[in-house]
């Protein structure tokens, strides 16, 4: 994992060196800076139309229609019954989360995100023990729970729990390497969509509790102390297909998908509900609606835009996944960046949303991450480890079953977004006087900027987040806000040798030829990296 960190840092440094020294790489396909993106004369593409506040819906606090369960809920796999996952995710090391958390604890009486509530709008969140009573019911816009849980605290799909775990999980086992970004923050769960539910008139009778088919274990209550490696799909007696698996393929979790629960209207209603509560400081939306760009805006999109604007006006930081490429969500790789092929909502409304692209463990942009002028920042989105979403499981998951016995790594922009939402919670805890706009600006300004005009591009936005910098740097834009001293840090470099002028002379003598050779080599390596074949793994 540490190797990925070093390689990623080297890529950023060498890219900046190339652009700054020879000045010819920036025009080669690099997107225009965000301020240069304007709507086409014949419609709205890169930039949405102005907000129409009259489109903000009234929250009905219930599903938009009756949905019934068509597939069984996610379960633990037989293969994962006795597997313990103690490995620290590469993303934690890459982002130096342990150091970031210590900085906040030093400033906030030992708490890392305590007192900050983060709303997770997703497939629901299972009551995993590693939330340690920091999980609250927000609401359910899909259906009533099947086992008496409070609204929003059932996760049949196995998606929302993994997202929430990245934000705020706090394992009580010191041997476990995984920990959430803001492990003292509180999660408020809203179940807004599910691929395991469908409109009642189009579905069969829900399967009886405990009825499953396929490969998962029949036991939903694992032996005490065991940890799950695989949160597999289950198809349920009354449904067909791959259970929870479709959410990890073909574009990830999508709103307005035929035969499933989850609409733009209910997403907008939840945002209004959150805005009216006055206690939630951060929102994470790892749900998207992706469509072909046609120059227009739909009624549902207008509702979401108005609701997002309303929530942002209530001092709430809104974070969204940038979206995953799929059959119905084409990559924005067109020559004219002002006219994307694909529109993704909520990220499209970038004035009020911080959308997050994904990188892999080499520091490269993940091939499934949708590009666009709305991308704000980027974070780790591959080889994910998080909480096992199966009901009753006390452990972690790092794989998901796909098509029966096929296991796949957990990945997607869905899991990059919670890294940023967690960071927003830490920033809000450390700097309680900053408003939502200032928090977003701090995250952007302290990110590792790409070598592109304006310090941003359409792939990673303003760059990969840098939590330590976001929690320590003083920004000129924050008048009167002073970043506190991060305190002494452990030295990362060996002590300097005795002074000698010989190395300096040799280094200077070889600079001319060596730099040219280095630039040529790195340019070739970068070209090869950009043209590598895309992995075939599914995304969520």
Residue ranges, per PLM feature:
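Extracellular S/T/G-rich loop segment that most often corresponds to the catalytic His/Ser-adjacent loop
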Residues: 344-426
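Loop/turn elements at helix/coil->beta-strand transitions in domains of secreted/extracellular proteins
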Residues: 113-117, 183-188, 276-283, 313-318, ...
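Solvent-exposed loop/turn segments at secondary-structure junctions
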Residues: 123-127, 141-142, 172-173, 193-197, ...
């Amino acid at each position: 994992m540490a190797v990925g960190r070093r390689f990623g840092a080297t890529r950023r440094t060498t890219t900046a060196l190339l652009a700054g020294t020879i000045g010819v790489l920036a025009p080669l396909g690099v997107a225009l800076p965000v301020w240069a993106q304007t709507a086409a004369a014949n419609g709205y593409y890169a930039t949405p139309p102005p907000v129409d506040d009259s489109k903000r819906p009234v929250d009905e606090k219930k599903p938009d229609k009756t949905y019934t369960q068509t597939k069984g809920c996610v379960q633990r796999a037989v293969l994962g019954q006795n597997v313990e996952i103690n490995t620290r995710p590469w993303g934690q090391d890459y982002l130096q989360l342990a150091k970031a958390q210590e900085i906040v604890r030093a400033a906030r009486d030992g708490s890392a995100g305590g007192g900050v509530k983060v709303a997770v709008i997703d497939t629901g969140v299972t009551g995993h023990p590693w939330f340690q009573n920091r999980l609250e019911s927000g609401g359910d816009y899909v259906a009533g729970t099947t086992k008496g849980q409070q609204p929003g605290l059932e996760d049949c799909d196995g998606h929302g729990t993994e997202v929430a775990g990245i934000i705020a999980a706090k394992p009580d086992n010191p041997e476990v390497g995984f920990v959430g970004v803001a492990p003292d923050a509180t999660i408020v769960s809203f179940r807004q969509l599910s691929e395991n539910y469908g409109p009642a008139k189009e579905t069969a009778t829900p399967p009886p509790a405990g009825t499953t088919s396929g490969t998962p274990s029949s036991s939903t209550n694992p032996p005490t102390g065991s940890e799950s490696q695989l949160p597999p799909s289950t198809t349920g007696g009354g449904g067909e297909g791959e259970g929870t698996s479709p959410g990890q393929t073909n574009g990830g979790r999508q709103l307005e998908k035929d035969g499933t629960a989850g609409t733009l209207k209910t997403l907008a209603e939840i945002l209004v509900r959150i805005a009216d509560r006055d206690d939630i400081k951060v929102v994470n939306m790892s749900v998207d609606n992706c469509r072909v760009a046609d120059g227009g805006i739909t009624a549902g999109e207008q509702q979401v835009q108005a609701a997002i604007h309303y929530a942002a006006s209530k001092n709430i930081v809104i974070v969204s996944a940038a979206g995953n490429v799929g059959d119905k969500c084409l990559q924005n790789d067109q020559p004219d960046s002002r006219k994307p092929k694909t529109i993704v909502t909520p990220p499209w409304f970038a004035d009020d949303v911080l959308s997050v692209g994904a990188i892999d463990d080499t520091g490269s942009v993940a091939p499934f991450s949708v590009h666009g002028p709305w991308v704000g920042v980027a974070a780790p989105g591959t080889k994910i480890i998080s909480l096992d979403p199966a009901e009753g499981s006390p452990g972690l998951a790092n794989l998901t079953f796909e098509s029966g016995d096929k296991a796949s790594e957990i990945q997607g922009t869905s899991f990059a977004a919670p890294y940023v939402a967690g960071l927003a919670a830490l920033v809000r805890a450390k700097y309680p006087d900053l408003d939502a706009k200032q928090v977003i600006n701090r995250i952007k300004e302290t990110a590792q900027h790409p070598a592109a005009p304006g310090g941003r591009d359409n792939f990673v936005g303003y760059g990969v987040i840098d939590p330590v910098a976001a929690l320590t740097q003083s920004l000129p834009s924050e008048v009167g806000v002073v970043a506190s001293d991060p305190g002494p840090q452990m030295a990362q470099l060996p002590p300097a040798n005795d002074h000698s002028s010989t190395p300096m002379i040799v280094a200077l003598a070889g600079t001319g030829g060596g730099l040219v050779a280095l630039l040529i080599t790195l340019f070739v390596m970068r070209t090869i990296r950009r043209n590598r074949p895309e992995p075939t793994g599914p995304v969520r």
